[in-house]
C-alpha cells in the first residue's frame, strides 16, 4: 500500500484481515491504529511492557503510556491487549547492552529491541495468541512489493525516517508488517491525531533509551557496571586529566570531558579520538577533523540483509554509521558471509565500533551490520 487511504474495493478486501498494532501510548502508534481502521482492517492493539521498574523507579512512564494507549483504543473503539516481554527484553537486549559497554563499545539497544522484541516476540504473540494476519508499528518506514519480495524503504519524512533502526528485519517480517505513518510527515500525523480527538496528539516524542528514561545515563550505567577511573591523554601521551570510566565516553564526544584551558593548546575543542582498553586510557585531541578521528573505511560484521542476499562484491552504494547522518557514498568488498569491508569515498569522522552501519540503494534499505574495526589508512 502506498497511501494512507483505501478505495472501497481495498476496504472490502481488508475487512477480512486482522492487524495487531503495537500501541506504545504515543502519537505515531495512535494514528497508525486510526488509519488502519479507516482502511477497513480489523484492528486490535497490543501494549508491550518490556522493563520491570521497581517501586522507587519514578523514571519509567509505562503506567502512563498504558493509560494513554487505553484511552486511544477506547476512542477508536478497538480492543487493547497487554503482554509482558520483560524477561525476553532482559535476556536479549539489556544483557547485550551491558556486555557491549563493558567491552568498550557503543551499542544501539533500540535496534536490538526491534529485532528481538517488536518484530520477533511481538509477531509470535500476535500470531499464536491473537491470530493476526499482520502486525503494525508506528515506525517511519515504508514497504514495497517487488518480484515476490517485500522491500523496506525510507520513510517519507526524511527527518523522522527510522529504517536505520529496522535493518535487521527480513523481507518476510516486512511483508507481515504495516507502517501507515511511514507515508506521512510528522506534522501531518499530529494534525490527524488532533482532528480525531486522540489524547496523544501533543504528547512529546520519546527520546533516549527506553529503560533509562529521564535519569542520567552515567548514574544508570553505574548501577550495573563498576566504573574504572583512569587517565585522559593526548595522542602524544601527555596526561591532561582523569576520566570516571571509559564506558561513559564514545568516539567523537566533545562534551563532558572536564578539560579545557590547557597550557600550550589552542582554542579548538577537545574530542575523544580513542579508548585504550588495555591501559584504561581515554585519548583526546583537538579539532573535529583530527587525523585520529577520521576513518577511510571500516569492517562490518554480524551482517543482516533484508532480502537475505545483500549487495554484490564491489557495489557502490551508501551507508549511515549513525542515525540521522547524511548518506555516505561507499564501495563494498565482501570478505565472507558475515563480514564486509567498506571503503568511504571521503574520510569520515567518529565512526564508532559497536554501532550499526546501515546500507541503502537509493530509497531501499538493504540491511546492515555492526561496525567492528576501522580502516585508518
Swiss-Prot record:
Q: Which Pfam families match?
A: tRNA_Me_trans, tRNA_Me_trans_C, tRNA_Me_trans_M
Location of this chain's protein in the cell: Cytoplasm
Site positions per UniProt: Interaction with tRNA? 139, 355
Offer an example of a GO molecular function term for this protein: tRNA-uridine 2-sulfurtransferase activity
- The cysteines covalently paired via disulfide bonds are 113-210
Query: What does this gene product do?
Result: Catalyzes the 2-thiolation of uridine at the wobble position (U34) of tRNA, leading to the formation of s(2)U34.
Please state which protein family the record places this protein in.
Answer: Belongs to the MnmA/TRMU family.
Chain ranges passing through the membrane: none
Judged by the first EC level, this protein's enzyme class is transferase
The Enzyme Commission number assigned here is 2.8.1.13
Specify the protein name.
tRNA-specific 2-thiouridylase MnmA
Source superkingdom = Bacteria
What's the gene?
A: mnmA
Query: Where are the annotated segments for Interaction with target base in tRNA?
Result: 108-110
Q: Which InterPro entries match?
A: MnmA-like (IPR004506), MnmA-like_C (IPR046885), MnmA-like_central (IPR046884), MnmA-like_central_sf (IPR023382), Rossmann-like_a/b/a_fold (IPR014729)
Which residues are responsible for catalysis? 113 (nucleophile), 210 (cysteine persulfide intermediate)
Q: Which reaction equation describes what this protein catalyses?
A: S-sulfanyl-L-cysteinyl-[protein] + uridine(34) in tRNA + AH2 + ATP = 2-thiouridine(34) in tRNA + L-cysteinyl-[protein] + A + AMP + diphosphate + H(+)
**A Gene Ontology BP annotation from the UniProt entry:** tRNA wobble position uridine thiolation
- The entry's ATP-binding residues are 22-29, 48, 138
Amino acid at each position: 500500500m502506498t497511501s494512507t487511504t483505501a478505495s472501497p474495493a481495498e476496504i472490502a478486501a481488508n475487512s477480512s484481515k486482522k492487524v495487531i498494532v503495537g500501541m506504545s501510548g504515543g502519537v505515531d502508534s495512535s494514528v497508525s491504529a486510526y488509519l488502519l481502521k479507516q482502511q477497513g482492517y480489523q484492528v486490535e492493539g497490543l501494549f508491550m511492557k518490556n522493563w520491570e521498574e521497581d517501586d522507587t523507579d519514578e523514571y519509567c512512564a509505562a503506567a502512563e503510556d498504558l493509560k494513554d494507549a487505553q484511552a486511544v483504543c477506547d476512542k477508536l473503539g478497538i480492543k487493547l491487549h497487554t503482554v509482558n516481554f520483560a524477561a525476553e527484553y532482559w535476556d536479549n537486549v539489556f544483557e547485550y547492552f551491558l556486555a557491549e559497554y563493558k567491552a568498550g563499545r557503543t551499542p544501539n539497544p533500540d535496534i536490538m529491541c526491534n529485532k528481538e522484541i517488536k518484530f520477533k516476540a511481538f509477531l509470535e504473540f500476535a500470531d499464536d495468541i491473537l491470530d493476526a494476519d499482520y502486525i503494525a508499528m508506528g515506525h517511519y518506514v515504508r514497504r514495497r512489493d517487488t518480484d515476490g519480495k517485500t522491500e523496506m524503504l525510507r520513510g517519507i519524512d526524511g527527518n523522522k525516517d527510522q529504517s536505520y533502526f529496522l535493518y535487521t528485519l527480513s523481507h518476510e517480517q516486512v511483508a507481515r508488517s504495516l507502517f501507515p505513518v511511514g507515508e506521512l510527515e510528522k506534522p501531518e500525523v499530529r494534525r490527524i491525531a488532533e482532528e480525531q480527538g486522540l489524547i496523544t496528539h501533543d504528547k512529546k516524542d520519546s527520546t533516549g533509551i527506553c529503560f533509562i528514561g529521564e535519569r542520567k545515563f552515567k548514574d544508570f550505567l553505574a548501577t550495573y557496571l563498576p566504573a574504572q577511573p583512569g587517565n585522559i591523554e593526548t595522542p602524544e601521551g601527555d596526561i591532561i586529566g582523569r576520566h570516571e570510566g571509559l564506558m561513559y565516553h564514545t568516539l567523537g564526544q566533545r562534551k563532558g570531558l572536564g578539560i579545557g584551558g590547557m597550557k600550550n593548546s589552542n582554542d579548538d575543542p577537545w574530542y575523544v579520538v580513542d579508548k585504550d582498553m588495555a591501559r584504561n586510557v581515554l585519548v583526546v585531541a583537538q579539532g573535529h577533523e583530527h587525523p585520529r578521528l577520521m576513518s577511510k573505511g571500516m569492517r562490518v560484521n554480524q551482517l543482516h540483509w533484508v532480502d537475505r542476499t545483500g549487495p554484490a562484491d564491489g557495489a557502490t552504494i551508501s551507508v549511515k554509521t549513525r542515525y540521522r547522518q547524511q548518506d555516505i557514498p561507499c564501495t563494498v568488498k565482501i570478505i565472507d558471509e558475515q563480514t564486509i569491508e567498506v571503503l568511504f569515498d571521503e574520510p569520515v569522522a567518529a565512526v564508532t565500533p559497536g554501532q550499526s552501519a546501515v546500507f541503502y540503494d537509493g530509497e531501499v534499505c538493504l540491511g546492515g551490520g555492526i561496525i567492528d574495526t576501522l580502516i585508518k589508512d
